[in-house]
UniProtKB/Swiss-Prot annotation:
Listed name of the protein: Conotoxin ArMKLT2-0311
Comp. bias (Basic and acidic residues): 23-34
GO CC term, one of those recorded: extracellular region
InterPro entries tied to this protein: Conotoxin (IPR004214)
Organism: Conus arenatus
Coiled-coil residues: none
Amino acid sequence: MKLTCVLIVALLFLTACQLTTADDSRDKQEDPLVRSHRKMQKSEDPKMAERCSNFGSDCIPATHDCCSGECFGFEDMGLCT
């Protein structure tokens, strides 16, 4: 009887921990491709660092090559904002 009560309490405790953890991590996960791209742009290692275009420079929206990460334009050509 005591063992059953201990198991039930442990199960309830673990369930509560899972629910609390799930609520805290909501909307914090970033798309892995965007996260790795930002890591490469901010890297101090010259081999890993990627050159990015400054504000007002030409860019290609599909490549996300602006330092700000935002390229305003059409498929082939745009400007970094």
